[in-house]
A protein has these predicted regions:
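C-terminal domain-boundary segment and adjacent tail
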Residues: 13-21, 53-59, 63-64, 118, ...
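Metal-dependent polysaccharide deacetylase catalytic core of the NodB/CE4 family, i.e.
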Residues: 25-27, 47-160, 180-192
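Active-site metal-binding loops of divalent metal-dependent hydrolases
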Residues: 31-34, 92, 189, 222
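Bacterial Sec-dependent N-terminal signal peptides
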Residues: 1-13
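Boundary/entry segment of secreted carbohydrate-active catalytic domains
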Residues: 12-38
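Alpha-helical packing segments of well-folded alpha/beta enzyme cores
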Residues: 30, 38, 42, 77, ...
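Generic recognition of short, well-ordered alpha-helical segments
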Residues: 40-41, 101, 138-142, 197-201
Length: 238
């Protein structure tokens, strides 16, 4: 990324914009567990509004349409999503609690998943979504090596467990803009899996609202925004 610089001629001051295009806030839409609904339902809505999402997958379960949890994505579906500009990232090989396994097993969980994602999609994962959002400094040191970062804070974007409504999502987004922050959402299933939606139109309307606010809110993949933020924070202006 090229950092966006703001220049005031009168005062002769230069500053680095908080977000690309000098927007007021940023949003990354992340989706966990490689659920097939992410391809059949979520991606078409994102594509309609030219929005890009980040999808965390578990290589062990790919293509399992009879999974008791929810039918899973296939690799061909992942390749199509990548072609549309979406990010496929590491969510571990088999979705264990990474804080409860030994270092050798942890390395297998991350490296095996990285390898198969690269082999199947042609793109090496540059970010990670931690299973159960569980991590420690020791786990992070292993998992984030060679990556731009990991999701460490998230806004649960679902209904059965997170209890989202149109009003609560609107409040979250307004606060994000007011505070000039980057917000990361976390969604699992739509009709299946965990934290399903009783009213999925609320989610689709949120996507539409993000597209409407494209001049003030930068919506992009987790890795793209994380890379910009890291560069921004590393800049020293003299």
């Amino acid at each position: 990324f090229f950092l966006f610089l703001s220049l005031s001629v009168k005062s002769q001051t230069v500053s680095v914009a908080d977000f690309l295009g000098d927007r007021q806030a940023a949003v990354s839409l992340t989706f966990d567990d490689g659920i097939q609904e992410h391809y059949t339902l979520v991606a078409p809505h994102l594509n309609r509004y030219t929005l890009r999402g980040t999808f965390g997958i578990n290589g062990k379960f790919m293509g399992d349409i009879d999974d008791h949890f929810a039918p899973r994505l296939t690799w061909e579906e992942c390749r199509r999503m990548v072609a549309d500009g979406h990010e496929i990232c590491n969510h571990s090989w088999s979705h264990p609690n990474l804080t409860a396994i030994d270092r050798r097993t942890l390395l297998v969980e991350i490296r095996k998943n990285d390898s198969i994602i690269k082999a199947e999609t042609g793109v090496k994962p540059t970010s990670i979504l931690y299973p159960f959002n569980a991590t420690t400094p020791q786990v992070r040191a292993v998992c984030e090596e060679g990556k731009v970062g990991a999701r460490l804070e998230q806004f649960g974007l679902g209904q059965r467990n997170s209890g989202c409504t149109a009003a609560s999502i609107d409040t979250w987004l307004r606060q994000l803009i007011n505070d000039r922050r980057w917000g990361v959402t976390m969604t699992h299933g739509i009709y299946t899996a965990w934290d399903q939606w009783d009213e999925p139109w609320v989610l689709w309307n949120f996507f539409r609202e993000l597209a409407f606010k494209k001049d003030s809110v930068w919506v992009d993949t987790f890795s793209n925004i994380q890379a910009y933020v890291k560069e921004r924070n590393a800049v020293t202006l003299t």
